[in-house]
């Protein structure tokens, strides 16, 4: 009260009044990204998909997260497994502990991904018929050690087949927000990439440091889908962290509504609360992945990311709220920028593109690297060098791409049908990488098998 009286005496102050709080219902979030059109036009609601929420836990007693059909007489749990890396790290089978949340952040995220919206069905999650796996890596204060975060990520990879985990949401980390050593940060990023390569589409929050900080661990990991936050009008939220990463990598990948989002309030029974942050944007994007996996279970995590990126609506970045566009905006084929990534996510186009992905796999075709590999399965190419690959099975063509996930698959220029070998040269790698904006390539190149 004393502060208000003091403020009232400041020069120029005529009136002081309460500032009302505006909230965004989940129905509004879903509308922005076209989610209801998916439900209505295709019937996909996430059934059969499982998303891991790696966070503070999940309150599985909340009416929006306790079961699939909001009928207490049926035995159809929404949360099918739970691992507590903080307080019960030795209980690893996933069914020994009932899911809980002593902080609330994870429950909120879980509801955005797959909440049923009970009891009033206003704040329905993006994939309301998807199921969840809770992985508690943050304590009651919302903090997480290197050991617990790594344990939760490793557990998710180990149990991905047991519980059919296809996607994961991690709303944690950020530049300078978790006190890890550089070695620990590298390990977490490496584990994040390993999760993706093992078959889990991993969505990570960009962070809430706005324009003042880079995107840090684990959102800086190369293979993950880093998510920035939008306001309801699809403009970038003022708090949403912007790239590049410390390594110079362009991030985020995509942007999703994250401001003042209503979702389940932990330990309230049936209450809902509004939070803001890239933490709220990330589980929304993970929910869309659950819908896409229902439409096409054969998708890889890289397919999920590429489809979301390619179908997003590009937004000019306008660094520092300047009136002129930033360099990426001037490229004829708009590319990822450090504010919006590839743009704001468009749900229905992404879903339809996912449903149309068709795979024809011939297991008789094999590729093998003939050049010598290091102990880490790497080849270090110097300028002028190449590495050789043998082909078995008579493919019609060979396609390749660089390690940069913004790159596109392309046919090998010198491979003809019926040939049994081909080479990838240092020049080919450098030419492709330099084509992508933001890359400065020189010297040797390393190829990971």
Residue ranges and their predicted role:
Residues 76-88, 216-294, 298, 302, ...:
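Extracellular S/T/G-rich loop segment that most often corresponds to the catalytic His/Ser-adjacent loop
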């Amino acid at each position: 009260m004393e502060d208000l009286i003091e403020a009232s005496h400041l020069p120029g102050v005529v009136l002081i009044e309460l500032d009302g709080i505006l909230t965004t219902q989940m129905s509004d979030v879903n509308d922005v990204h076209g989610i209801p059109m998916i439900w209505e036009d295709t019937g996909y609601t996430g059934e059969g998909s499982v998303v891991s929420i790696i966070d503070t836990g999940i309150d599985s007693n909340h009416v929006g997260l306790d079961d699939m059909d909001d009928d207490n007489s049926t035995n159809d749990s929404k949360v099918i497994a739970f691992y507590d890396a903080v307080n019960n790290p030795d209980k690893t089978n996933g069914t020994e502990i009932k899911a809980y949340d002593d902080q609330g952040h994870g429950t909120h995220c879980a509801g955005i991904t797959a909440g049923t919206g009970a009891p009033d069905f206003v704040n329905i999650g993006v994939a309301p018929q998807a199921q969840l796996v809770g992985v508690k890596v943050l304590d009651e204060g919302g903090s997480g050690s290197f050991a617990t975060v790594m344990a939760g990520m490793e557990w998710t990879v180990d149990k991905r087949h047991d519980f059919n985990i296809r996607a994961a949401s991690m709303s944690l980390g950020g530049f300078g927000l978790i006190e890890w050593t550089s070695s620990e940060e590298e390990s977490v990023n490496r584990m994040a990439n390993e999760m993706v390569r093992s078959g889990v589409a991993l969505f990570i929050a960009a962070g809430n440091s706005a324009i003042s900080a880079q995107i840090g661990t684990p959102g800086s990991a190369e293979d993950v889908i880093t998510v920035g936050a939008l306001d309801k009008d699809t403009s970038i939220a003022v708090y949403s962290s912007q790239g590049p990463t410390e390594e110079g990598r362009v991030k985020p990948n995509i942007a999703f509504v994250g401001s003042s989002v209503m979702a389940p309030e932990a330990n309230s029974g049936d209450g809902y609360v509004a939070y803001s942050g890239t933490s709220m944007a990330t589980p929304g994007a993970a929910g869309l992945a659950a819908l896409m996996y229902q439409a096409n279970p054969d998708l890889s995590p890289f397919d999920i990311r590429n489809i979301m990126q390619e179908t997003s609506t590009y937004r000019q970045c306008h660094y520092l709220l300047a009136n002129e566009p930033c360099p990426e905006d001037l490229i004829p084929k708009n590319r990822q920028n450090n504010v919006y990534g590839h743009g704001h996510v468009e749900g229905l186009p992404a879903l339809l593109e996912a449903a149309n992905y068709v795979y024809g796999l011939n297991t008789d075709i094999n590729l093998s690297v003939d050049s010598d590999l290091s102990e880490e399965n790497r080849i270090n190419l110097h300028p002028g060098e190449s590495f050789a690959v043998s082909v078995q099975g008579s493919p019609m063509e060979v396609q390749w791409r660089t390690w940069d996930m913004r790159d596109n698959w392309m046919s090998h220029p010198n491979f003809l049908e019926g040939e049994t070998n081909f080479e990838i040269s240092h020049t080919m790698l450098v030419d492709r990488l330099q084509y992508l904006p933001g890359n400065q390539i020189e010297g040797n190149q390393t190829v990971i098998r």
